[in-house]
Amino acid sequence: MQAKQQLLIDGAWVDGDAARFAKTDPVSGETLWTATAASATQVEHAVAAARQAFPDWARRSFAERQAVVERFRECLETHREHLATAIAQETGKPLWEARTEVGAMIGKVAISITAYHERTGERARDIGDARAVLRHRPHGVLAVYGPYNFPGHLPNGHIVPALLAGNAVVFKPSEQTPMTADLTLQCWLEAGLPAGVINLVQGAAEVGQALAGSADIDGLLFTGSAKVGGLLHRQFGGQVDKILALELGGNNPLVVKDVPDREAAVLSILQSAFASGGQRCTCARRLIVPHGAVGDDLIDALTSAIAELRVAAPFSEPAPFYAGLTSVEAADGLLAAQDDLVARGGRPLSRMRRLQAGTSLLSPGLIDVTGCDVPDEEHFGPLLKVHRYRDWDEAIALANDTRYGLSAGLIGGERADWDDFLLRIRAGIVNWNRQTTGASSDAPFGGIGDSGNHRPSAYYAADYCAYPVASMEAETLVLPETLPPGVVL
């Protein structure tokens, strides 16, 4: 399987008509993929192709659509190592983690089929001499925007349920990960998906703006930053005829009540803050620990563990815990964010540094910002802020001091503490003695506040990929025995 380095419109691979762009490996510097972006006209052609393909695809039985999706899963199995290598190269993540991402893509098919039947599907019951029937119908043409941190798994979590429901799709991946999208779309064609049911438009913000501005899409499914999600929300303002599903970021708190097992607590913090190099939307960004010996001892142990954490190139042996960020520019932004926190009074406990010039490899950063005036921003990388608290109420207040509400975690405490935390914390994913990045594949995924609205790319994705239709129906038209008051026939 080789990348086409083109757009996919109505079943045909075509060159873009706009500016040329390229994707380079953020660690090695190798050019991985280069092509021309889609023009606004080509975006409209892709939408038109999806619109034309939609009726026939929607009329097919669910079993027929499921068969195509299951063949797609088989294609992923066949090409899993090639896809994993591409993901590792594009994102900078370790090969072992890229392999787990492809595994998640494969697993998403069975999960989405189950979710379709449980969350949507069809229900019926008798009511007198009629039947009440609940059905679900696809919206039509859905635009799917993919993020760069999980370029296979997260868009897949939109696309698979959208296609199962009978929608047609126009997919706009991140310009940071065009190759993964290219290869994934080849798998859809290999699976026998009809021409036009899925289309691929490559490029940067201009392509995304053109797609979001198309009058002929019926909805947009987005996973990405709160900034871009907010722009889309404003752009869609007043368009009540369109579904907009947003899964955005978070400034996620991890609260330490006490430390029953220091090594276990340190590991949970490392996995919460630095998994994928901090490039997960559920990563802990704020570590909230008590003043005094409990907090001091934990921070000392954490600092020591950070110093030993292996960070290296994606294909290194022995394998690293995490590797590079998705781009050198992203690494530059993280280093600038650290400098800003220091300028605001933050005290570095473990300073984040670039490990190799010209690359996106960064060491983990840990900075104490207790009492500092710091922005409520998601620093999307290996940078963890420490806040100290004096009592439980202050810990909860610090945890909730954010406009976001994606994930939160509690380490230690008794059942009563957990119950109180669960009641008072504002987040869509709340974990106890497990990392904040841990989530069940058959549970909703998403948050409140500026972290989004629906629960995109997870079990509840079926909810926004189809709309319910309620019917009262009978085989024959029958005159009732008793007429309504005031009616004479």
UniProtKB/Swiss-Prot annotation:
EC numbers: 1.2.1.71
Signal peptide interval: none
UniProt organism field: Chromohalobacter salexigens (strain ATCC BAA-138 / DSM 3043 / CIP 106854 / NCIMB 13768 / 1H11)
Binding site for NAD(+): 224-229
Gene Ontology biological process terms, A to Z: arginine catabolic process to glutamate; arginine catabolic process to succinate
Domain of life, source organism: Bacteria
PROSITE patterns the record matches: ALDEHYDE_DEHYDR_CYS, ALDEHYDE_DEHYDR_GLU
Alphabetic keyword roster: Arginine metabolism, NAD, Oxidoreductase
Function according to Swiss-Prot or TrEMBL: Catalyzes the NAD-dependent reduction of succinylglutamate semialdehyde into succinylglutamate.
Protein name listed in UniProt: N-succinylglutamate 5-semialdehyde dehydrogenase
Family that this chain belongs to: Belongs to the aldehyde dehydrogenase family. AstD subfamily.
Enzyme class: oxidoreductase
The UniProt record lists the keyword Oxidoreductase: yes
Active site, renumbered: 247, 281
Pathway it works in: Amino-acid degradation; L-arginine degradation via AST pathway; L-glutamate and succinate from L-arginine: step 4/5
InterPro entries named in the record: Ald_DH/histidinol_DH (IPR016161), Ald_DH_C (IPR016163), Ald_DH_CS_CYS (IPR016160), Ald_DH_CS_GLU (IPR029510), Ald_DH_N (IPR016162), Aldehyde_DH_dom (IPR015590), Aldehyde_DH_Superfamily (IPR050740), SuccinylGlu_semiald_DH_AstD (IPR017649)
